[in-house]
């Protein structure tokens, strides 16, 4: 079963990704201490309240049914894309900064 705290940590981590930047499920998983698959599952169930288009798979892709809306958000934020995916190598968030921001964002959970 998925603990409420893991869900909260994943969502708070996603909230720290700046506009125009993306991270992979694995990047969030490493921060939170869970698996990329669990991050994907949490995003599928609870990610609607956060900037879900900033979290992709390692190739910069997002689930196909979300692509039209994600494309609009990527364009609005100036995210580097190539057709149906983000160019994650060009627009990945600074992971050291993300880690620092995440630690501050979850300080009240420890």
Predicted regions and their residues:
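Nucleic acid-binding interface residues in structured DNA/RNA-binding domains
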Residues: 1-110
